[in-house]
Amino acid sequence: MQKSVRYNEGHALFLSVIARKEGTKRGYLSKKTTENSKWHEKFFALYQNVLFYFDTDQSARPSGIYLLEGCTCERVPALKVSTVGKDALDKLQYFLVVFGHDGQKPLELRTEEESDCDEWVEAIQQASYSDIIIEREVLMQKYIHLVQIVETEKVAANQLRTQLEDQDTEIERLKAEIIALNKTKERMRPYHVFQEEEDPDIKKIKKVQSFMRGWLCRRKWKIIVQDYICSPHAESMRKRNQIVFNMVEAETEYVHQLSILVNCFLRPLRMAASSKKPPISHDDVSSIFLNSETIMFLHEIFHQGLKARIANWPTLVLADLFDILLPMLNIYQEFVRNHQYSLQVLANCKQNRDFDKLLKQYESNAACEGRMLETFLTYPMFQIPRYIITLHELLAHTPHEHVERKSLEFAKSKLEELSRVMHDEVSDTENIRKNLAIERMIVEGCDILLDTSQTFVRQGSLIQLPSVERGKLSKVRLGSLSLKKEGERQCFLFTKHFLICTRSSGGKLHLLKQGGVLSLIECTLIEEPDANDEDAKNSGQVFGHLDFKIVVEPSDAPAFTVVLLAPSRQEKAAWTSDISQCIDNIRCNGLMTSVFEENSKVTVPHMIKSDARLHKDDVDICFSKTLNSCKVPQIRYASVERLLERLTDLRFLSIDFLNTFLHTYRIFTTATVVMEKLADIYKKPFTSIPVRSLELFFATNQNNRSGDHVNDKSPRLCRKFSSPPPLSISSRTSSPVRTRKLSLNSPIGSKVGILDLSTTSSSAASSPTSANPTISPPPSNNNNNSKPPLDLSRGQSPSSPEQSPGALDDNAEVPRIDALCGKLRRSIRRAVLESVSLDKFIPESPQASEPGEISPCRSPSTPRHLRYRQSGVQTAENSRCSVSPASAFAIATAAAGHSSPPVFNNSERTCDKEFIIRRAATNRVLNVLRHWVSKHSQDFEMNGELKMGVICLLEEVLRDPDLLPQERKATANILSALSQDDQDDAQLKIEDILQMAECPKAECFESLSAMEIAEQITLLDHIVFRSIPYEEFLGQGWMKTDKTERTPYIMKTSQHFNDMSNLVASQIMSHTDVGSRAGSIEKWVAVADICRCLNNYNGVLEITSALNRSAIYRLKKTWAKVCKQTKALMDKLQKTVSSEGRFKNLRETLKNCNPPCVPYLGMYLTDLAFIEEGTPNFTEEGLVNFSKMRMISHIIREIRQFQQTPYRIEHQPKVTQYLLDKTLIMDEDTLYDLSLKIEPRLPA
């Protein structure tokens, strides 16, 4: 019996699966069976030369397999059928697959579509392996033929190349033969040709003509070149080239800084993060150094491109370089967005002592040059604005038809978009970087500065006076040298703490062992000596009322007093106003957070959190992520109206916002507008404050608010002091001065959300300053035994509104109420006088004080014994109480007086609200005016109209019959400060010294000592420097065409610098012999070194710049006589004041020195120009760029710190007459001509 054919069924099934999924042709066909000649529809799949068919397209196994190798496929006509089914069958298309041997029945298939039939026939016909083999053979033959042709062509090409080389050799040989033949022909010419000589006169004439032609050509070319050199185009190109050269130097420095960041910090910290006990995690390293390494690689490429362009000088094409840089700006954008988070992570990591120790080790690397990590992290933030300034300067010197102009303008526009974001981020992180820089300067470290919410306010030098028992001052004199030396302290004020440090000789800071870190919430500020204290009276006479006290009452240690002495009355006023404002802010925040906060433990007070205008961007304001000292988002952009609204928002006053506003308001508004706003707030507080702010100020939760709405048109809402005060207010007072005593009762059941002062059950202790107040429990109501929960956030009890307030069960609720009342009493007593007094200048007379009051010489804003303790927070949380912040203000305001508690009915509560708002508005106006007058007195000295407006407003305030005693005293203090004489009258002015200098001089340089000259240079430099009003630093006026009118004092400072430098150069060049000049140089270097010791770095730069002038620097014989020690000292001085790296050495030196000090003004002008040109003052929508204002304010604050600390140097007219004698000064050309006479140029 014949066996069946075996085949690999598994592989066949595998191929069927591939055919069903990836076959060449797939689809349903009708197949005619061989048994009964019926047609059955099957799913066919063609794969290579095998045809599979399945029952359906979902079948896993094929029903049959056909091998198509050697078969043919052709179409056949339709079958003959009866007439009935003819129409249907005519539409079907038939084709046959005929196999290659006889006896095999063909495969009959049909489809419904003709196109489908043609595709199947064509696919089956092409499914033949033999056909493919034949085609391959044909292609191989063609390929071999082409290869032979190519080889033949290569041989022919080599032959032609050889022929060309041979022909070149032949040409060279023929040329050499021609040259040789020509020489031979010359030698073979007849001798008589050379005997025909020209006439000697003709030869002379030709020679003269040749000389004349050469001279004329050279003269013409010289004129052409000279004209071009003097042309504007050449001058522009010279400046353009200089800009490019400076750009290359700056880029070199920047790449070096990035390499230090990566090699000295990033890579070592990555390795440290991989150790067994890592001081930092890899995630923190990535967060701190995001994209730093990529930025370094990018700028290394950019730097190499710049150097390649310089190699092609004078052809400088830079646009394509910036085209390379622009697509990489997204890397910078990620770095910018991460910058603030980076510094916050770094501050958190520094709390780990292991990391801090490791970081100090890295920062001590010589390559870092004493700079900190956060300094290197900030460098990339300044690079894009630096490119913008460079492009701006390049475009200024690039002709409009230049090929690069459009590319440079495009690059500048793209960079400006990123620069705007960068400036905002730098402004937002300025506070973190400042805190970290101060923390690094303190040898012992200071953990409180690692709190990123801590805001820097002020720093400066104060003298700490010694104290003895009972807190009385010992008998010391202000002029005592030992007192100034031993008692000098470097003080730093932050929003939460006050640091007192001593500075070592190396510039590092050391915190005092006792009282080095003062928590402001535990401090009480006393600005004037107690009028009843004889010792304090004497000290006021001794110290000229420049001293003030800070009484510290820590919770875990005995109380002590710190007595500080300011260098001037203006400095004292600035310090005390800032300290007082910080204490007010932190106690207000503590009051609202600990007592009136909801149980959700939210750090931001509820009223602020509920006001979307304080944190949500709008068309007229945009906020940053950074919070200010009042836990409110900082303003990034805002309209003038929104800025004035923030200034007069009665809920809070951020000290950093106030300082920035007062420094920069001239840029976007005028003093008159600010004054009008303050006057409106005082006279019409309800109409001038946004309605939403008023609602959130009271934060009531009444069911029917319509009864409490204030009528804006009500005449009693405007202050009219010509008529008696409103009856609703005056009826509750027994005197023109409103006196009310605080009364406490449980607000349970009250209809009004604020703490109702009209219902009382017990009064406060007789003295607001009593240490242990007692309070009786609230009365019980026998008619109502219900126990509603103590939820003051709703302002309404579950019981009916008609219930008596304080309806409680004695047995169950009294302890809970006692705890609440005790906590309220502590916080309220702390708030007494906080929100109503601002007196800072002069003590009140003793008759104005009642026996129970705090001493009027103490700052009422910071009363003694009224302080907030942390335990109060826990009590507040446990008692689950929440009252609107307006309650706190109501209590604090009501507690200012001492009369018996009045009782009000419900109809009088609206008037009570009016009284609260009026008191808050008065306080805000007085507070702003006090800061304005004490810190910016120049505004009122230069603007008589503004001064009269303030005086009129304050006099109007004094006529208010409802004015509280503390408000009256604060008003009088401000008026006194405005009306007093100029505080600097006792100090010398440059005009007085110039008048003295007009007298005949009696001294010469040789008769004056180096110490005398250095001291008087320092005195003159500081007098000129301190005379610059702060408004001249705004608007870049010193770079305008009318700079003399806009910034006269800055121009005087610049002129004084140039005159002093010219005097030094002229004095040296006035000597005729080498030894005298060398001795003069050595003496001037000694003067410069003494100036350095006196912190007069402006004087150091005046002298070193004079010595580096070309007229002096080229005198090699003179410098050869100068001793090596003097040269080494001069190199040290030059390094200190070098402009390299944006004066990085000078900045570090200024950071480590105590005022008085005279910095180089040009450094700050460069910073201000950098900020001004980097970003505009207003956005495209017309909003004020307040982030830019904040950066400008930081620079002005640093300048004013040095301006306001005077030198105690005695004026010596004989020395200043010599220094200011302009007859001794030579101009630059005269100096250089004299230098050439002294040492002529060596012959080339």
Curated annotation (Swiss-Prot):
Residues 728-743 have a biased composition (Polar residues). This is Ras-specific guanine nucleotide-releasing factor 2. Residues 631-745 form the N-terminal Ras-GEF domain. It is a peripheral membrane protein. It is found in: Cytoplasm; Cell membrane; Endoplasmic reticulum membrane. GO terms for cellular component: endoplasmic reticulum membrane; plasma membrane. The Ras-GEF domain and the N-terminal Ras-GEF domain mediate Ras activation. One of its GO terms (biological process) is Ras protein signal transduction. Residues 22-129, 466-584 form the PH domain. Residues 1009-1241 form the Ras-GEF domain. Residues 147-189 form a coiled coil. It comes from the Eukaryota. SMART domains: PH, RasGEF, RasGEFN, RhoGEF. Residues 201-230 form the IQ domain. Residues 759-774, 781-806 have a biased composition (Low complexity). Functions as a calcium-regulated nucleotide exchange factor activating both Ras and rac1 through the exchange of bound GDP for GTP. May function in synaptic plasticity. It comes from Danio rerio. Residues 706-715 have a biased composition (Basic and acidic residues). Keywords: Calcium, Calmodulin-binding, Cell membrane, Coiled coil, Cytoplasm, Endoplasmic reticulum, Guanine-nucleotide releasing factor, Membrane, Repeat. Residues 239-425 form the DH domain.
